[in-house]
Structure formats: C-alpha cells, structure tokens
C-alpha cells in the first residue's frame, strides 16, 4: 500500500484489522502490529493482538520472535508425510503482520523485518500474511529493498494511492497521482488495474468523544 500523507493508508489498515478480527476467532488469527506513529495502537482487539512494536528496534525483536514460530511451520520441520501431501503442515492461528509507515522503520538502513525473509516464499502455506503501508516519496527505489522485493516476487497485490507522479512507475504501468483520500489503483498480478475507493473505519467505542 503506497500513499503520501492523509491519503487514507492508516485508515485502511484499521479497516483491515477490524474486518479480519470480526471474521476470525482468536484461535484462528493473531496480529503483529508494527506502528511507529502509533496510529494503530487500538486497531486490534486485545484478544487478537499477539505483539505490538512502535519503533524499529522493537519491531526487529518482534519479527525475530515470530520467525521462531514460523520455523516450526516450515515443511522440512514436519515429520508427517501425509500432512505434507495434504498441504496442512502447520498448527496454530494465521499470523497477520500489519505494518504502517514502513519507510520510518527502515530509515538509516535498518531492516527490522529481515527475519521474515526466509518465510515469504512459503507465506501462504504457513499461515503468514502481510499488510504493509509506506509513503510514495522514495518508493521507486525503496521497493527494491530486500523485504519489499520479496513480497513483490511472491505476487503480492498492491494499492497505489495519492502521491507524486514524478516518483515514477511503481507497478507495471501504474503511477501515483492526485487522488481523494481513500482512493487508489488496485494492482493484482494477472488482472487489469482497478480504481477503488476504500471505506472509512468508524472510531472504536473507546475513542468516541476522545
């Protein structure tokens, strides 16, 4: 998810979190939230929240801890040949990693999500999912950092929201540009690019009136 300030990235992350938490139980799904601006601090219900990190150092530790669990889910760590044949070789909840302001986490060459790199190619099979947001400014170069490049190579979908067209091509044939908040171009491999408008995440009860 790419977009500059006030385009609706954080709102959409909150919307995704709420929708998944409403749909899946705490036994089925857990979130890891990486949130340097604290815009998602109350986005995930407590029962679904497996970990929260507000800076690059803590994010790196959280990612490393999750990686230990993911290692147990990899096919070579499973002895049951029938489970391998069926594709059901992991137990436990699906893990959704929500990342806002990825550009802030990777400032000064930091790579706090590097522990996930060995698992991105197998993410779908081991119950690992990423929703990552960063600004458009600097994205043309940043999309080739190891983690984002791994996501792109795995066939991840993308949403290009408001930003400077001068940043260049962000996905094949897709450039940022002026857009109202919440609007962007949805990019998915093998499908035509679509213009979409995202919804507004209503405030959680504890935030109403605050």
At which residue positions do the language-model features occur?
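P-loop NTPase catalytic phosphate-binding loop
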Residues: 1-79, 87-156, 163
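Phosphate-binding and hydrolysis-coupling loops of NTP-dependent motor/remodeling domains
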Residues: 12, 133, 140-210
């Amino acid at each position: 998810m790419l977009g500059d300030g006030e385009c609706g990235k954080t709102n959409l992350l909150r919307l995704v979190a709420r929708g998944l938490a409403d749909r899946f139980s705490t036994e089925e799904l857990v979130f890891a939230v990486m949130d340097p601006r604290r815009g998602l601090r109350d986005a995930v219900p407590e029962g679904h929240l497996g970990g929260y990190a507000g800076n690059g150092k803590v994010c790196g530790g959280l990612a490393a801890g999750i990686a230990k669990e993911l290692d147990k889910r990899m096919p070579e760590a499973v002895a049951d040949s029938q489970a391998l044949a069926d594709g059901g070789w992991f137990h436990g909840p699906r893990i959704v990693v929500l990342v806002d302001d990825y550009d802030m986490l990777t400032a000064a060459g930091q790579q706090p999500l590097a522990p996930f790199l060995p698992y991105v190619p197998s993410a779908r099979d081991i119950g690992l999912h990423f929703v990552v947001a960063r600004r458009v400014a600097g994205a043309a170069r940043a999309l080739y950092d190891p983690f984002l490049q791994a996501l792109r190579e795995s066939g991840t979908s993308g949403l290009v929201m408001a930003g400077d067209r001068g940043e260049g091509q962000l996905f094949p044939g897709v450039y940022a540009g002026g857009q109202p908040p919440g609007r962007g171009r949805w990019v998915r491999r093998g499908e035509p690019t679509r213009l979409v408008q995202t919804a507004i995440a209503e405030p959680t009860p504890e935030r109403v009136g605050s």
